């Protein structure tokens, strides 16, 4: 009688496989913790206040804060007032990166936010619900001697969320407000070496444009991007893991197709999980180094969403197939109540992503976080997603408990057998329970990773620039997913061992009567493992 490798492999060999996987898991964490730098970094240049007295402010001239032809600048708005320079003639110019440095495609993306230094004045304070209007123009070039080329231009409105930490008195004039950062734009690729931002704050008293926004002293143009060193480590992991998963996936399915019976649902789902893991592994990001693929962020989110949906569905089906009787199992339609919400949630996440990153493919200045309603909806969406992830984990724990109880109940219904055979089944049950505990640990870390990434993205958009993601957590979780999928396909592949009347996997004998009784009890059910067949045995009361 043949089963899966997890049941027929000797304890010594199984322990060796487990130790090897554990060492690889530790290595995945160490790669991020000891080799890779932190995933993201940022530059924070202070914009130069340039003077532009041309009648047509929207002409093709670009104002540089430094270089061979720097703009004429002022130090403060008081100087502008003394020189009778109007606010409409002042342009905040910022160059990214700082001098003597270059941007690189290895940075993958660039998120730009503004940090305003606003001073309190009794005759010029920030009014409630004030909006700031930004006339933004962005240019790029790949050589310091080239002319600037326009990348994007738009007039955007952003809400000012500022708090004055002291009383509004004459004595506190000049004190700065505590303001949230203002999301400006997001680029899905960093394909050019130099970027130039020219930002104007147009004033129009008749239209109440930029009135009641306080006295702006300085503007910080903060650029957040992926660390190039982390990108190299990430690409290297993907390049190494992709062929490993493809090879084990082909080997697994070849063994399945060599069997006389057709594959059962559990085996198909394991194979589908391998496909989704391969989809997220394939390092197509290498092409983003040479091509300006601005859609890579959206494509990466879609790949990760497909894998999440497949992984969560697999855990539900994996537990369910070890709970149901043979008459109910092996049909995907049975799981519509559990898999349906996962599919619906994945579609909601896709729509949410398309509403921001999809629109940003045409308008990089668009952000759902720029309005009160949009920010509240986005934050509520993140909170609900986190709550749903926690509820899913609790439900999975309940299903695992049900599986354990079902296996124990079915085991008690087996006919009396020899001590050696009972020990054999005790060993199988122990191995299965250990795998289920590993599954729960995997699920817990996946939920934590999902919530962490969602909160982190919210912090980027809402202004918490002090957060530092742990590279070891990223590489460790990514390695864990691959090792888990690899282990499933290896351990649940059909074994080539067949045990006759005189042996078992531990070398223990069994009488022909006992073998006949056991065979008629559970082996008429198709399935990858003995425990799978045992769990689906129909009650004979």
Swiss-Prot record:
Residues 1-15, 254-268, 325-331, 401-431, 493-541 are cytoplasmic. Keywords: Cytoplasmic vesicle, Developmental protein, Golgi apparatus, Membrane, Transmembrane, Transmembrane helix, Wnt signaling pathway. Enriched in the animal hemisphere of the early cleavage embryo, where expression persists until the late gastrula stage. At the neurula stage, strongly expressed at the border of the neural plate and dorsal midline. After the neurula stage, expressed in various organs, including the eye, liver, heart, pronephros, otic vesicle, and dorsal neural tube. Expression in the developing eye is dynamic; expressed in the eye field from stages 23 to 27, and from stage 30 expression is confined to distinct regions including the central part and border of the eye. The chain crosses the membrane at residues 16-36, 233-253, 269-289, 304-324, 332-352, 380-400, 432-452, 472-492. GO terms for molecular function: Wnt-protein binding. It is a multi-pass membrane protein. Belongs to the wntless family. Required for a subset of Wnt-dependent developmental processes, in particular, eye and pronephros development. Regulates the secretion of wnt4, which is required for eye development. This is Protein wntless homolog B. It comes from Xenopus laevis (African clawed frog). The gene is wls-b.
